[in-house]
Each structure stands twice: as structure tokens, then as C-alpha cells.
Amino acid sequence: MGALQWLSITAAAASAVSALTPEQMIGAPRRTEVIPNPSGDTGLFSTSQWSFDTHSESTWWSLIDLESGETTTLTDDSDIEEIIWLGSDSSTLLYINSTNAQVPGGVELWIADSSDFANYKAASLSAGFLGIKSTVTDSGDVHFILRGKSYPNGTAYNDQLAETYPSTARIYDSIFVRHWDTYLTTASHAVFSGTLQSSTSDDGNVQYTSSGGLTNLVNPVKGAESPFPPFGGNDDYDLSPDGKWVTFKSKAPELPLANNTAAYVYLVPHDGSATAFAVNGPDSPATPEGVEGESNNPVFSPDSDKIAYFQMATNTYESDRNVLYVYSIADDTITPLAKDWDRSPSSVTWVDGDNLVVASQDLGRTRLFAIPGDAGTTSSPRTFTDGGSVSAQYVLSNSTLLVTSSAFWTSWSVYTASPDEGVINTLASANEIDPELSGLSSSDFEEFYFDGNWTTLQGWITYPQDFDSSKKYPLAFLIHGGPEDAWADEWNLKWHSKVFADQGYVVVQPNPTGSTGFGQQLTDAIQLNWTAGAAYDDLTKAWQYVHDTYDFIDTDNGVAAGPSFGAFMITWIQGDDFGRKFKALVSHDGPFIGDAWVETDELWFVEHEFNGTFWQARDAFHNTDPSGPSRVLAYSTPQLVIHSDKDYRIPVANGIGLFNTLQERGVPSRFLNFPDEDHWVTGQENSLVWYQQVLGWINRYSGVGGSNPDAIALEDTVNPVVDLNP
């Protein structure tokens, strides 16, 4: 275990960088949200950092003083999976050790003191578990819950001890076959509960030891699963503060998983003495009429009497508007709060027994909003934060919250705020700590507004290092995915606009029709409208606005790039006159052939977007097919195509098909493939190659490669290039 070490994180980094490079951005420390102790004077977080010298990652845990911002290194034990505060004692920690000396593939629970990390083992668990939550009950015992995989009979599934078969065959009688990056198996995910019994030694110290086994709280509900992979996690379940109840979210077990988004919030005793009941399911008298979409983020009130959660109205629509509901356990009633508010919040925190705070996308940021417990249907929640994007918020005292956020210019910011005072005290910001990020400033980024196809739209501009408005910089035009998504004021490891800009570009990121955080009407308008009207027209109008407004942007030598839906738009642009406005194009994991959507994993998505299956809505599928012969004949702009083997949302054949077509049309093109990545590229070494190839490609054709001696080139990648042409 590492010794405690003091580090000031409020002083500015010693040296400034001339530009943000991919190596600096990827290799900078990555910190988690800060979790306060019960007294609210100390926070806990972890940090990981990749080294391109050793090609390895280091991880350590730290404490931060919530008055001064000073931090201490708590431990650098790489076997520790996660740590939480235990009970009302502000110095006791409970953590999961990722190894188990007695059970291969198992984990252990340990108790430690935050002052010196003196520790002892409290329990041995027979499988891999994550996401522990706990509370100390009136008896002094610890009730806890955690998540893991489960056999169909409800017992915990251990990957290392699971039965193997002579054949590798997979056999399916229903969909899903695969999801995101994984083929589904008979093992599912579940929330388990357990108890640590307390005892007091002769010297007065309290110790905790395992009491009994674990109880699977999800398995008794046939077909239920929680959390649901790949994006389900700790926010999908909660433990009541009194330790008596557990709530969890599960997709509707009676509906086909690949075709539906409907999900319910369940309530179950911690000891599993009764089967979990869906409080807003079809059998509940409390279920609001006409509300049939996905539920998420169930959270108990401080008095354990209520559950706050979000739910969408429409089944099959993953980007419908979240509405905040409160379920009363005693009354078996559900009450909506601020039901008509035109935002879609994503996380909720109880400030006290009645009042709540939610985080929601709002005009290209994620802000905090206060919602009183008696908020009526037409109530308009009030925001009390501004720039950046909140990732976590915890109540300290007197309605003060500890907030973790990020922004374009900082990967991690920690501050206190309250609904009455707004931001109170900034404790830490990564760009003032990390040498890799020093020199980044909010002044490098600004928003702009332009007239789109049918409404005023927002976008972002990122300036290069040492920007001079008297000079001209090639345009880098980035199109976001989704399409129900948005470019936001947040740290983006996959598409960081400043990394693009510091090659010598002015980066423009428009938020067209379909974008989120600007009202539900803008989001909903993308349905059946990918190319025939608003969304595509919005992008051309954004380009024209930039061309007409900013003398320092060189649109003659511009480039365009985008992921997923953005990649679809890139290829659609390739087949249109608009494609000739750009010197180079980059498409990452985009669809190419319209009918190939039948291969996707989440069928609910495409069947909602195009209003039917591919045989019911043939015109909609064909009208958004960039591989149509007339479009292919127009292909001429150099294009980099990126697609990875484990992308089951938009399978890799789409990328190979596009590359084949470009090659046969004689268009300068390259195919970049990662066999171990999915719809996103997240591995650090792979991410570096991704940036090298993307930036090298656009630099070659925009002229930046010739004007900037430090510009990245395609040849910077050490991997060999396969070229079988004679």
C-alpha cells in the first residue's frame, strides 16, 4: 500500500504547452468523480494515467480536503477495484479487492481507515463483483449491494470457473444475438445483497465480518436483468439509507429485448424475503397512464420513504424526454415533477426529504437544476451552474453540493455549489494541475448561433494555439453522432476539438436538427429527416454561415469528419455537391448500405428512426442509403474510412463496403481497422493511432501538413500499411 503523500492541486502547472497533442491528451491523468465523506470535509477519488513509454497504466486513490483543495495519495494498490465511505464514520472505508487468494475469479471486501489505510479483510466473495453500495443499519450491521453476473438459476457467475464446451458453437432461438461488442450468453447481470455483521472487540474497536451468503434480488423476476449492459451501471440500482429496501431498473421482461426500450423500476426487500415488484410496471395501479418508455436512475430519499426516477413516455424511442417521477412507498403513488419542462435530465440527487437537484443537458452544457418537491406540471426548474458539463453531484450540508464536472478546456473540475448561491468555491481544475493540459483556457472556445432549416441552431468554434484573426486557418467541420446527441462543453477523449485545432485548424461543431439539450422538438424532428430536409440542410447552412461570417476561416481548404451518424453524413456529403467543398473526409463507424441496418443490434433504434422494419419502411431505408448508384458516381473527395471488428451496432462490413467502393471508383482512400475495438476506440494505444491517422489524413489534403512543421503525418504511425496493388 502506498504511503500518504501531500500534493497541492490548486497551484498552476509550472510550464505551458505550445499545443495539445494526442499523446498529451491521451496520456494526461484521468480522474473519477469526487465522493464526500459523511462529515463533508474530505472527498475520495481515483486517478489513472497511461504511459506511452512503458505502455502501461498506473492507478491510485486520493483524498481531497474540501476546504483547501489539498490532496493526499491514499493508496496505489493496483488490485483495488473501488472504494466507498462506510456508514456515518467519516474515516472508515469499504473497498473491493479485485483478487481472491482462495477463489480464482472471486473478489474480497476489505475495511480500511482513511488516516493510514490500516486494513483487514471482511469477506470473501466467490465471483467478480462491482458497484458496491452500503449503509450501517440501526443494529450496527452493514447492509450492502453490488452487481455481478448470474447463472439462470440465480447463483453468481464466475468467468474463470465457468463450464467450457468442446465446441465453440453459439445457438440462439431469439434476438438479441449480440449487443454493442458482445455475443449474449445464458449468463445475465443481477444485483446481489449481503450483510457484514458488526462486533466490538475488548479495546472498543468495531469490526465487520461476513454474515451468510449473497442474495440475488433480480433473478426471481423471470426475464429481468439489472444492470443491463453495456451502459448499465451503478446508477441502475440503489440501497435505501435505512438498509431495508433495494430498488433497481430492468428492461421490461415480457417484451423482446432488441425491439423495445421499455424498462421498469423495481422495489424489493434487502434480504430478498419477497419478490421484486415493478412499481411502474403494467401490474402496478400507480403506473401513470400512457407512460411506457424507459425508466432509469432510481434513487431513494434520505428518509427511505420515496424513490425518485426518470421515465420516458414512448417505448422504442431511446431519446425521448426523461420526466422526473417520485414514488411513495407508503402510499403506492407516483407523482410527476415539472412534467412539462422541456429538458431531459439524466441524474437526480435528493437535497433533503423533499427537494431535488437534477443534471440535464442544456444549450450545449450539462447543468444542475433545482426542483422542489411540490413542483407542478408547468414548473420551470432553475439552473444554478453555467459552463461545462456536470458528471456527478453529492449533497454536503445545508443544500450545498459537491460537484465534479469537465469542459472543453479541463478534463476534471471540482467545486461546491448550491441552488441559492450558484458556484461557491472551485477546489481543483485539471488544466491548473497537469502539465499535459496547462495552457488550455476557456477563451480557446466559443459558441455561435445560425439560422438552420427551420429554427435557430447552436454550434461551437475552437481556436488553435496562438490564434491570430488576421491569418487564415483551414476549416475542420465535425459532425456529431447519434443523431440524437450533441457537441457539448465537456472533455471528449474520442473527438477532442482542441487536438484538431492545434494542428492548425479552426474547428466548427454545429448542433443540427436531432441534437439533444435544446428542447425535445429539435430532437424529435430528426425522425424520417436524416437527409430529405432539416438535418442535412442544417449542416450546409452551418458551413455557409461560417464561410460568410469568419474571414479567418479558410473554407477552400476545409475538411470534414464525423462518427456514427456523423460518418453517415460524411458519406452522404461525399455523394453530393457539398462534398466538393472539402479537401478530405473522415468517416468513423458509419452505415453505408441502407438495408444493412437489419444487421444492427438495437433494432428499436432504426425501426423508430425510419418508422418501421426494413420491409415495412422500404422508402425510408432507401432514401437514406448513401450507396445508391447516382451517389456513388459522384464520389471524388479523398476519404479515410474507419471501422472496427467488434462494432455490432454498425457492423464492420459497412466500412469495408464503403472502402471497396471508394477504391473501385479510384478515389484516394484508406481503411483503418481495429480488431479489438467496438463503436468507439477506447484503448490508449489504439486511440493514439486513431488520432495520428485522422489528423495525418486531413493534414495531407488541407495543406496543414506543409505549413505546420509540427503537424502530424500519416507516417507517424508505426503500424505497417498493407498495399497489395502491383
From Swiss-Prot:
Example of a GO MF term: aminopeptidase activity
Residues listed as glycosylation sites in the UniProt record: N97, N153, N259, N398, N453, N529, N611
InterPro entries attached to this UniProt entry: 6-blade_b-propeller_TolB-like, AB_hydrolase_fold, Peptidase_S9_cat
Sorted UniProt keywords: Aminopeptidase, Glycoprotein, Hydrolase, Protease, Secreted, Serine protease, Signal
Enzyme Commission number(s) from the entry: 3.4.14.-
Localisation: Secreted
Chief location bin: secreted
Annotated SUPFAM superfamilies: alpha/beta-Hydrolases (SSF53474), DPP6 N-terminal domain-like (SSF82171)
GO biological process: proteolysis
Active site per UniProt: S564, D647, H679
A cellular component term, taken from the record's GO annotations: extracellular region
Signal peptide feature range: 1-19
Entry similarity comment: Belongs to the peptidase S9C family.
Summary of the function given for this chain in its UniProt record: Extracellular dipeptidyl-peptidase which removes N-terminal dipeptides sequentially from polypeptides having unsubstituted N-termini.
Stated name of the protein: Probable dipeptidyl-peptidase 5
Organism field: Aspergillus niger
Gene name for this UniProt entry: dpp5
